[in-house]
Swiss-Prot record:
Posttranslational modification: Contains 4 disulfide bonds.
Protein name: Dendrotoxin A
Tissue note: Expressed by the venom gland.
Organism: Dendroaspis angusticeps
Similarity comment: Belongs to the three-finger toxin family. Short-chain subfamily. Acn-esterase inhibitor sub-subfamily.
Length: 30
């Protein structure tokens, strides 16, 4: 599962991975 957010792509990735779990990781691992 690709769970990584940067800026605008984060939204696209988060939706594919799950805004809940991904969002948390993205904040810790930008």
């Amino acid at each position: 599962t690709m769970c990584y957010s940067h800026t605008t792509t984060s939204r696209a990735i988060l939706t594919n991975c799950g805004e809940n779990s991904c969002y948390r990781k993205s904040r810790v691992h930008p």
